[in-house]
Amino acid sequence: MKKIKKAIIPAAGLGTRFLPATKAMPKEMLPILDKPTIQYIIEEAARAGIEDIIIVTGRHKRAIEDHFDSQKELEMVLKEKGKSELLEKVQYSTELANIFYVRQKEQKGLGHAISSARQFIGNEPFAVLLGDDIVESEVPAVKQLIDVYEETGHSVIGVQEVPEADTHRYGIIDPLTKNGRQYEVKKFVEKPAQGTAPSNLAIMGRYVLTPEIFDYLKTQKEGAGNEIQLTDAIERMNNDNQVYAYDFEGERYDVGEKLGFVKTTIEYALKDDSMREELTRFIKELGL
């Protein structure tokens, strides 16, 4: 069985929920404290043993490439000024993994974005990490899925429970059997209508997929939003070859919409020793 050493991170979206900030700046580069959100995702992949990452980009995404590239002039200035801690942080972002880029030529959905990286992946199993979800966990969320793949040899989809009122916002699984946190899946449903979801187990931005998924994506018809939906292709693959779901452990932060982004920033700031005390005082002074 081949080891999971490659990952895809889709980053071609327009970031419309954050306009006008994302008119010229990629949404993935918006910072939680002093790091862009996409760096948290790449750090998770690196901790899970991923060596090669391909980021699927679109127009106006050059800042992502620049961030993970070395900038010798900046490093020299930091070194000359004795700012060794900042220098280490700047260099760290360039050393996380081997990072490659491919452009998604059309905005045709997540499934289409994954297809854009087919040549890079080849005939290997791979991980997918979506940038809207930062997960804090002792064992990286995607590593938990990799462990299930290595045990079963099958594709594994990361899920977590959501309130029933929110199920229409996600891809949802209809579980067939349960073994601890692991599920065999009867059916995958992309964004079911309110009140029709078969469970409250939602697909949460982490996948380990076998290369066969590309064959299903190649023939996948447009689904929700007139886009090529990855969930629809996974559902078809599941009919032929069992796909598992795994309720991964960890605290998930939704940075794909404004309120979640603000909440995440506050929580991360409160975990930071350098600002916790003053921020706590400020929040109390608001008297909310």
Curated annotation (Swiss-Prot):
GO terms for biological process: enterobacterial common antigen biosynthetic process; UDP-alpha-D-glucose metabolic process. GO terms for molecular function: UTP:glucose-1-phosphate uridylyltransferase activity. Its EC number is 2.7.7.9. Pathway: Glycolipid metabolism; diglucosyl-diacylglycerol biosynthesis. Keywords: Carbohydrate metabolism, Nucleotidyltransferase, Transferase. It catalyses: alpha-D-glucose 1-phosphate + UTP + H(+) = UDP-alpha-D-glucose + diphosphate. The keyword Nucleotidyltransferase applies. InterPro entries: GalU_uridylyltTrfase_bac/arc, NTP_transferase_dom, Nucleotide-diphossugar_trans. It holds the Pfam family NTP_transferase. The keyword DNA-binding does not apply. Catalyzes the formation of UDP-glucose from glucose-1-phosphate and UTP. This is an intermediate step in the biosynthesis of diglucosyl-diacylglycerol (Glc2-DAG), i.e. the predominant glycolipid found in the S.aureus membrane, which is also used as a membrane anchor for lipoteichoic acid (LTA). Belongs to the UDPGP type 2 family. NCBIfam families: galU. PANTHER family: UTP--GLUCOSE-1-PHOSPHATE URIDYLYLTRANSFERASE. This is UTP--glucose-1-phosphate uridylyltransferase. The gene is gtaB.
